[in-house]
Amino acid sequence: MAKNKSQYDSTLNLPKTLFEMRAGLPKKEPVMLKDWDDNDLYNQLMKHNEGKPQFILHDGPPYANGNIHMGTALNKIIKDIIIREKNMEGYQAPYVPGFDTHGLPIELKALSSVGDKKKDISKLELRQICEKFATEHIDIMSDQFKRLGVIGDFEHPYLTLKPEFEARQIEIFGEMAKKGYIYKGLKPVYWCPDCRTALAEAEIEYGEDDCDSIFVRFHVSQDPNGVLAKYGIPMDKTYFVIWPTTTWTLPANEAICLNGQFEYSFVKIGEEYHIMATDLVKSVMDACHIENYEIVGEPVSGAEFELMRYNHVYLPKEGWVILGDHVTLESGSGCVHTAGGHGVDDFNVCQKYPQVPITVPVDDGGYLTELAGKYAGQRVWAANKTILADLTASGAVMGQVHIKHQYPHCWRCHNPIIFRATEQWFCSIAKFREDVYKAIDTVTWMPDWGHDRMTGMVRDRNDWCISRQRTWGVPIPAFYCKKCGTYHITDATIKAVSALFRKEGSDAWYKYDAEQIIPAGEVCEKCGASEWEKDTDIMDVWFDSGSTHAAVLDERPELRFPADMYMEGGDQFRGWFQSSLLTSVASKGCAPYKSVLCHGWVVDEQGKQMHKSAGNGVEPSEIIKDYGADIIRLWVASSDYTVDVRAGKNIFKQLSEAYRKIRNTARFILGNLDGFDPNTDCVADDQLQDIDRWALAALDDLIVNTNAGYAVYDFNKVYHAVYNFCVVAMSNFYLDVTKDRLYCTNGAARKAAQTTMYKILVALDKIIAPILCFTSQEIWDFMPKTEGMNKYVVFEQMPKAGQYAADDAFKAKWAQLIAVRDEVKKVLEQARAEKLIGASLEASVTLYCNDAVYDLLNSIPMDELADLMIVSHVELVKGEGGAASAVEGLGVAAAHATGDKCERCWKYSASIGSHPAHPTLCARCASVVEA
C-alpha cells in the first residue's frame, strides 16, 4: 500500500493470491484441455445432468476438407456457449459434432493427389482415397474445435460416410420415392462444365460478370393465321427482334416467346418491319442507335402472333412463336429468345407446346456439339465471341449493349456455370410445398425475418436436382431394366440396398453387379424383364446432410427428433436448413427443428469480405497463439452475430484489454479472500453494511440481465452486462470503497465485505463460464469452496435472480448516495488541481444539505460515509454552503483534513498517538495491531 516500507505493512491484510494478473492463456489452456480430456469431462457432464430435461442443439456438419477459419470458429463457439449455458441452466444438453464427408471438393483433392494415374484408377479406388482424405481432416478439424474450448462427443462424431448413416439416407430416399416425390426427367439444371456435374441451387454463388447483349432479328417464314396480311405487313420483309444475353445459346433456339397480354408494334426501319413490344420500342431504338423509324398502324395483341414461324438466324431450321407469362417489359424487346435446353422458364413454356423440341447442343464439358453447326467444338465462352462476330457481319445484329450482371458460378471451382437440360433425378417440391409452408410456421426463427426468408425460398424454388455425375458420394439406389430402360425403385430394393450399405458401406454399390444387389424375383413393371443395371449417379451432398434428422437424431440414443435448435450461418437458408426441412417434411410430415438461429458472415475490420489474396484475413490459430482461445470466445460474445461480424488484430487487441478488466476484478476478489473459509467465515445478512447490500443488489441485477440475454441467445447483452458490472459497479466503486475495511480491519466488517465478495465471485464466475470457459475454470480452481461445490464450474447451476434483490426504495437511496459521491469527487478533483490535497484521504468534506439530503446521508454511519467518499472526515451541515452541485439540496466543500496521517491506514485523525506503543497510528489501527 505504501511506497516506502512501513513497520506496520505486515499487519495489513493486503490481497494475496496465486491467480496471476497476466493470463498466459496460450500456455494455460492446453493444460486445462488435457485435464478435461483425461477426466472425460463431456461424458461426466452428461452423466451429471442425467434425468434432466433435454435440450438438443443439432450440429450442422462442416465440410471435412481443410483447416477451420474465423467463420467456423464463430459458428462452433456460439454453439458451445449455448451448450454450456443450457447444461448449467438445468438441462442435459448433449453435443454430437458432425462432419460432411462426401462431395466434389474432396473428390477433386483425391484426383489431384494421384496425378497422371487418375485415368487408371477405378471408382472404388478413388472412393477409398477420398475416404482417407476426409478422415484425416476430421481429426485435424476436431482438434482445432477442441482447442477453441468446444465441448462435445468428439470421440463419436457423426459422419456422413459411415455405413449406418448411408443406410438411413437410402431409407429416407426410399420413403420419398414411395410417396411419389422422387422422379427422373429431362430438365435444365445448373451445370458446371469444369466439374462436369449438375449442381443444386445451394451450390451456386453469384458474381458480377461483363457480357455483350445483342438485339438480333429473326426473319418471319410462315404466318398461318394471316396476321401480317391482316395489317398489311409484307412477310418477306418482317422480323422478330430478340435480346439474348448468352449468345452461345442461339444454336439451341427453337422458339420466340411473347406475352399474350402485351401489345406489340410493327416498327418500320427503311423498307423492313420489326416486331417488338410497344412499350419497349423507344428503349430498343435508343440502344441500337436508330433514330429514323416509324411505328406502323395500331398495336397488336401478342396473342395474335402465336404459332407463327421464323427462320433460325443461321441454322437451317424454323422456330415457333409461342406465348408465356414470364415475358416482362422490364428490358429487352418483349420477344424472348427461347432455348428450352438452357433455361428453366424456357423449358417450362416449351412443355406447353409439344411441337417445340428441346435442343441441347452442349456437352458435359461445355463444348458445342454438331447441333451447333459450324461452331461445333468451341467452348461456350469462346463461342459467344465468334457467334457475335458472324451475326454482326451477316447484318442480323441490330445493336449491341455492354452490360454487367450477376451471373451464377460454381461454389466449388468458382467458374461460371451454364443451364443445361439433362436427364437427372429430382425431388418434386411442388407435390408437398404446402406442407413445407405449414412446417415453417411451426418453427421459431431467430431473427424472426428467417420465417419470411425461408418461405420465399421455398415458394420460388424449382424442383430439387438431387443427382450428381461424380463418384464420391452415396449412390442413387435405382436400377434400370436392361431391356426397356425403365428405372426400378421398390420397397424391396430400398430395403436390400439399405441393408447392404449398413453392413458394408456404399462402396458395396461399386463392388457388386446389379444382380448381386437387387432382391431375387424383382421384375420390370413395364416389360416384365428381370435383367438390371445400376444407376451411375450419386446424391447431392445436401441430401446427405439433409438426412441427419433421420440418420443422427433418430439413431443416436442421447438425441431425439425433432431437435430444439439448428444454428448455422445465414447461407444455410438455401443449404442445410432447407434441405433438412424438405427431407423431413417429405418423409415425416414435420420440420426437423423447433427453432432456427442464424448468424452472419465474418468480415474484416472495414466490413469487407476476407480473402487471402487481399491479405485481410485473420486465422483462429494466430489469435490463439497471441491471446488464447478465450479471447476468440469473448469476441464472439461481444459481437452482434445476427449481422456480419468484424474481426481483425486491432479488435482482438481491444478485447484483450476488456478481458483484462474482467480478469483483474476476479483477481482482486480472490486476493481478498485469502484465508477466507466460506464454510465458517460467512456472516449473516444482518451483519452486512448497506454498501454490501447494494453490491449484492447490483449482482442480482446482473443475474437478471445475463439470464435474459442467455435466454434469447443474446450474448452481446451478457458481455456488456458483465463488463459494466466489473468495471463500473465493482472496480470503480464497491471494491474501491471497501479497501480500507479489507486491508485495515480484522473484525466483522471485514468478513462482511469478504462474504459479499465471495457471493459475487461465485455468481460472476458461473455467469461467464459459458463464454470464458478456460478463465472461469481457472478462477474456480482458485476459489475457496463450500461443501457440495463441483470440481468443474460447468457442472454448477446458473445463479437464479431474486436471492439478493433489493426493493425500489433501497435502490433509489443508493442511486442518490452514488450521485452525492460523484459530486464530492468533482470537488476533490478541483481541490487536487489547486494543490489543496493530494490523495483523497488527505481531504475533509463538508456536505451542506437540505432536510431530505441530510436525512439520507445521516442514515449512514459517519465512518461508512467517509469510506464511501474515500476521505478522512465527513461533516453534515443543514443549510446552504459550499460549491453547488447537480444534486438538489446539496453543497460540497473540501478542505485538508485536520489531525495527523496514520502510518498504517493513511487516514488523517486526531487520535494519532493515543496508544503509547504506537505513536504513529490512529486509535482504530492501534487496537487492530494490539488485538
Regions found by a protein language model. Name each.
Residues 192, 410, 481, 524-527, ...:
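Short cysteine-rich clusters marking metal-coordination/redox-active sites
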Residues 912-920:
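Short linker/helix segments within small regulatory modules
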